[in-house]
Amino acid sequence: MIVVKTGGRVLKQNLDRVVQSIIKTNNKIIYVHGGGDQVTELSSKLGIEPKFVTSPEGIRSRYTTKEELEVFIMVMSSISRNILSRVSSYRNSIALTGADGKLVLAERKKKIIVIDERGRKRIIDGGYTGKIKNINKELLVTFSNLFEVIILSPLAYDPDESTLLNVDGDQMAFALATALRSDNLILLTDVEGVMVDNKVVNKLTVEEAKELSKKIGPGMNRKILMAAEAIENGVKKVIISSGLVEDPIKNALEGKGTVIE
């Protein structure tokens, strides 16, 4: 069982090849997709102004209001069903959210610290974004025994507030891979791997990943920090690779990109 995650940007640019790659691989797959760009597009069409916030660490992320959560749910459902319809003729597949069967439980972020337009720290309401707290491993194993491909949208359930929450797709992929102690966790991105001085870093140990995370930009630094933590918690290998090539999953499994182990 491998876990594969692609962001919305990769899906916009290379959806057909990603789908074919899922079909062609011999591995059972848990496939987590993003779709942030698509959410922004639909929100704008509906007259809902997308809102983004910047953390003190310099990470820019979506701020999910109640209105935009509804858009997020619509877009994620559309993406997952589109992929399901293409894959199902070839592989036994199912499309889920993390909320289905309480597969992924999360806690709503009550307050978050952001940097405002004047560069000052502010504390604001957390909106409808969540932090993953628990994976129902027993249910996940049951699904993986029944289906070759599990397509998962990054939505989780908050049992305390009885609501769906937008969760970070990378965080969901890492949580799932860690729960299953997966052999491979593949992050398909719009770059070839971890870049240093315009060159791909081919291999990183856990310690090297932690050290490098201090020197590269926000976004990728979070990926390699989470990768290091996943390896320490039982995942055998994390591969950060391009999702824009002919056969992205095969390409990653062949070691193209950055391998952390």
Swiss-Prot record:
It catalyses: [amino-group carrier protein]-C-terminal-N-(1,4-dicarboxybutan-1-yl)-L-glutamine + ATP = [amino-group carrier protein]-C-terminal-N-(1-carboxy-5-phosphooxy-5-oxopentan-1-yl)-L-glutamine + ADP; [amino-group carrier protein]-C-terminal-gamma-(L-glutamyl)-L-glutamate + ATP = [amino-group carrier protein]-C-terminal-gamma-(5-phospho-L-glutamyl)-L-glutamate + ADP. It comes from the Archaea. It is found in: Cytoplasm. Pathway: Amino-acid biosynthesis; L-lysine biosynthesis via AAA pathway; L-lysine from L-alpha-aminoadipate (Thermus route): step 2/5; Amino-acid biosynthesis; L-arginine biosynthesis. Involved in both the arginine and lysine biosynthetic pathways. Phosphorylates the LysW-bound precursors glutamate (for arginine biosynthesis), respectively alpha-aminoadipate (for lysine biosynthesis). GO terms for molecular function: acetylglutamate kinase activity; ATP binding; N2-acetyl-L-aminoadipate kinase activity. The keyword Lipid biosynthesis does not apply. InterPro entries: AceGlu_kinase-like_sf, AcgluKinase_fam, Asp/Glu/Uridylate_kinase, LysZ. This is [LysW]-aminoadipate/[LysW]-glutamate kinase. Substrate binds at residues 35-36, 62, 166. Belongs to the acetylglutamate kinase family. LysZ subfamily. The record marks 5, 223 as: Transition state stabilizer. One of its GO terms (cellular component) is cytoplasm. Keywords: Amino-acid biosynthesis, Arginine biosynthesis, ATP-binding, Cytoplasm, Kinase, Lysine biosynthesis, Nucleotide-binding, Transferase. GO terms for biological process: arginine biosynthetic process via ornithine; L-arginine biosynthetic process; lysine biosynthetic process via aminoadipic acid. Its EC number is 2.7.2.17, 2.7.2.19. It holds the Pfam family AA_kinase. It comes from Sulfolobus acidocaldarius (strain ATCC 33909 / DSM 639 / JCM 8929 / NBRC 15157 / NCIMB 11770).
